[in-house]
Amino acid sequence: MAASSSSTGLPPQHQVFINFRGEDLRLGFVSHLVEALENDNIKVFIDNYADKGEPLETLLTKIHDSKIALAIFSGKYTESTWCLRELAMIKDCVEKGKLVAIPIFYKVDPSTVRGVRGQFGDAFRDLEERDVIKKKEWKQALKWIPGLIGITVHDKSPESEILNEIVKEVKKVLKKVSLEGSQKVVSVDPSQSIDTLSSVGGEKDKTFGIKQRLKELEEKLDLVKYKGTRVIGVVGMPGIGKTTLVKELYKTWQGKFSRYALIDQIRGKSNNFRLECLPTLLLEKLLPELNNPQLDSIEEPYKTHKGLLRERKVLVVLDDVSRREQIYALLGKYDLHSKHEWIKDGSRIIIATNDISSLKGLVHDTYVVRQLNHRDGLQLFRYHAFHYDQATPPKVDFMKLSDEFVHYARGHPLALKILGRELYEKNMKHWETKLIILAQSPTTYIGEVVQVSYDELSLAQKDAFLDIACFRSQDVDYVESLLVSSDPGSAEAIKALKNKFLIDTCDGRVEMHDLLYRFSRELDLKASTQGGSKQRRLWVRQDIINVQQKTMGAANVRGIFLDLSEVKVETSLDREHFKNMRNLRYLKLYNSHCPHECLTNNKINMPDGLELPLKEVRCLHWLKFPLEELPNDFDPINLVDLKLPYSEIERLWDGVKDTPVLKWVDLNHSSKLCSLSGLSKAQNLQRLNLEGCTSLESLRDVNLTSLKTLTLSNCSNFKEFPLIPENLKALYLDGTSISQLPDNVGNLKRLVLLNMKDCKVLETIPTCVSELKTLQKLVLSGCSKLKEFPEINKSSLKILLLDGTSIKTMPQLPSVQYLCLSRNDHLIYLPAGINQVSQLTRLDLKYCTKLTYVPELPPTLQYLDAHGCSSLKNVAKPLARIMSTVQNHYTFNFTNCGNLEQAAKEEITSYAQRKCQLLSDARKHYNEGSEALFSTCFPGCEVPSWFGHEAVGSLLQRKLLPHWHDKRLSGIALCAVVSFPDSQDQLSCFSVTCTFKIKAEDKSWVPFTCPVGIWTREGNKKDRIESDHVFIAYISSPHSIRCLEEKNSDKCNFSEASLEFTVTSDTSGIGVFKVLKCGLSLVYENDKNKNSSLEAKYDVPVEVSFQEPEHGIMEEERYINKRRSDDRRPKKKRKTKRDDIMIISTVTQTCVPSVNARIEDKVTG
């Protein structure tokens, strides 16, 4: 009932011991297995080979005589105490390195065996054996042996394939034992089980996404770049594929070294042996010529063999390291500043671990194994779910479900592999059911992999892990504040969890992989159902009700998280519901379906009021809290975060209470709130959100000394703001009734954002606003009575929004990057000095209906929107100076500027032409793609004359001259004249695109799509395009054209091109708009030999006289023959003019001073 293997030199009686239970198995599967093994000359022992009358105890000695034990777990296995005694003996032999155990799960789930659950567990608990010690020993064996790599036999598994697989693995072990003389085998960490044997066949697992990972890892180990010894750590979350990667590297790099060693499963081996035994494993592999090598000491294990070891460079891979001590045991104590005494320079050492902190100071670099991308994840999943390799794809329905499983796994290789195997040969119904189950909890085996890492955590780290799962994707500072307020040691616990890749921080937020999150929820669910003293976090409505009904211990409840969107029936809370929850730290009633939590239909009732004696609570969130104030017995002494949105609250509590650690208060849209006196002692309050509190008139008796963010948006009765907290960074006064800012507003030395949008009675801005040296964003949109804005000569102001104001002149704003002056009926002109605003990149002039002239604009400007400037007639010449550029996109929009004079239109097209050429010369700075690098539009009905190809209608077809796509082609300029019908009064957006097709040498068409223009209506206001408009865009030479360059660079052939322009909107689709005319220009880089160091010339050669089809090919052939004839003539220096080529007039660029100032601060609104 267990098995072992031996070399050919072992006693001939048997090599394999089979441990099993049940006569049905003996007569069926086991008899077939014995036959298959013996057919391959493998000696087998099962109990029916024993001599009649022989004591059963002597059977245990057969285990010692074996080299392989096959433990066959079936549903009836635990009915036999004898099977369990054998299993305990097998475990003992394996731990001593005398036996290899291969578990076989015969029509029983491995997790059922490991967890001793279901009928399997019931039979074990019903055993007559009363010896508690023995039962404990057997249970350990039941958990331990199934943790080894094994084989699963399903109901539908082909028996012949399974038998072949078992025989193959047995022969593999026997061969290894024969070569090595002895085999030391220890328990296999479940996290290593990504290499578990297939349950349906013996084909070797395929790896997907490994090539890129391997390449990136090899770069850190480069033998040429790094001459000395190099130690690299490979880190990542459990099951992410570290073992797969380092084993692939080991296999690939073995040939680069004469000595190499892979020590895997170090976590398991160090758990079962003393650390001092680990160096022997390494020494045996690096010096195989030594017979039974001896170690010197724990501190210097390789001292005696140092000379031999230093003769050769070595490759050493240490996999599944869990502690720093394991590294010291294998490599000796060292640091990067001192050389290894026994390792020759040029060696390479790779250490794979879940815990990056164990590598601190021991590695030169680390490689973080990330999740698989969707493509590789899908391939890995399909390979195991369907057993195909791209040749015979599965049915469409399964393909769709495959995407959902891959999305669930989020690129986690182990999850993809296990899920694929579980779903192999299952029907559609099973797949759909499995997906529903996974939404509640992870698949069992994946949970067990994570459990290994979780079990190694300290108690504080476990609490932190489970708490963080409740607040994942929240701000790091917020999560740390909550946890540290409960336990000061939580800061270190959070750091440890990050080092072990159980959590991550990204963009200032704490993140947790979905699989880890579901694992944490599963742990909480188990704690709730199993009872005991474990602290619990309740997520399910019924669990919360059970606390009320005293069927669950209230004292152990650590958190309540109730999603009100899932509460479908009216639920009443007893007055004393929270009375005994003395350890409750988090109480959160929220709505996951509405991010603003405004649509909730509250079904939680408190008919008799509420007692809330929660002294330990750190976080109190209660959406639509129904009472006028928090109960008198509520003690906020430890409260960190208070959130009561859309509540009925009128004041927080009666009187004043100590709130020494309160940092965040959110009472948004509590329309009855009129007093905040309860916050007079909140000296650490950092953020206060009172948006929509329409009954609030002032902030009297509120401690604002530490406040950083204050939100009073849409507090329509709020009229005065006398208090100026000096630490304030963001102040939202939009929609209030404030008529002026206090004179001491200049004291806000740290203010970054000030929002006063729609303050309809605000008339002036005090001059002291210029003293706000840190202010980066000022919003005055919709302040219709505001007529003047003070000069700001020295400021960090980056964004100024003055749309909807009555300002008549623009102030001096040297540092502004984004200026919005739209919807201003009083602005007649812009100051001539605007071209000196050296950092301005975005200027919004929409609907400035009195504006008549646009002066020269700064060369840094990337975006100009003058839509609806109905009085605009002229623009400066030049519209803006052209300067050397970096990778940016430029848009100049003059839609609905119906009074633009012809000279203004010509200057806009001239600027577009010059900009296209400049972008052409700088094309090396741009990524290849189909996005327009420059676009403009204006009222008109003609294609500009510099477009060499022009056609009436939306379709342009031409033959392009030979070598048109040579190396100097950098991009294409496109033009479309579009007519808009009068019926488009409700137009909200539209886009103009061009489908460009080129006929390749094989006569196939190579298409690509180019954007030409796009327009979007502002807000929900009605709008329309009033006349025909010209759209121009420049697109960098697409990848498909670059490919033509490479293939046909030396061929003198004509090309055919077809361009079709279309206009689509959000409501109409294609067909309502009409493209009247269209055009194309090919834009080439300048010949650098023509340019001097002082000026840049912009030559745009464009073939314009391409023949229409009715002229045939004769004139084109004549052109080629003439060109060939000219090439044979002696070259003379002369200026030629050909009818079929037009050179766009050369424009000399005047020197423009470079902008030295760099934008360093980023403002988020």
UniProtKB/Swiss-Prot annotation:
Keywords: ATP-binding, Hydrolase, Leucine-rich repeat, NAD, Nucleotide-binding, Nucleus, Plant defense, Repeat. It is found in: Nucleus. SUPFAM superfamilies: L domain-like, P-loop containing nucleoside triphosphate hydrolases, Toll/Interleukin receptor TIR domain. Its EC number is 3.2.2.6. PROSITE patterns: TIR. The keyword Repeat applies. GO terms for molecular function: ADP binding; ATP binding; NAD+ nucleosidase activity, cyclic ADP-ribose generating. The active site is at residue 86. The keyword Repeat applies. Residues 211-474 form the NB-ARC domain. LRR repeats lie at residues 592-613, 614-635, 636-659, 684-703, 704-725, 726-748, 772-794, 795-818, 819-836, 837-863. Signal peptide: none annotated. Gene3D superfamilies: Helical domain of apoptotic protease-activating factors, P-loop containing nucleotide triphosphate hydrolases, Ribonuclease Inhibitor, Toll/interleukin-1 receptor homology (TIR) domain. It catalyses: NAD(+) + H2O = ADP-D-ribose + nicotinamide + H(+). Interacts with RRS1B. RPS4B-RRS1B heterodimer interacts with the bacterial effectors AvrRps4 and PopP2. Belongs to the disease resistance TIR-NB-LRR family. The TIR domain is a signaling domain involved in cell death induction. It is involved in heterodimerization of RPS4B with RRS1B, but other domains also contribute to the interaction. The TIR domain mediates NAD(+) hydrolase (NADase) activity. Self-association of TIR domains is required for NADase activity. Disease resistance (R) protein that specifically recognizes the AvrRps4 type III effector avirulence protein from P.syringae. Heterodimerization with RRS1B is required to form a functional complex to recognize AvrRps4 and to mediate the hypersensitive response. PANTHER family: DISEASE RESISTANCE PROTEIN RPS4-RELATED, LEUCINE-RICH REPEAT-CONTAINING PROTEIN. This is Disease resistance protein RPS4B. It comes from Arabidopsis thaliana (Mouse-ear cress).
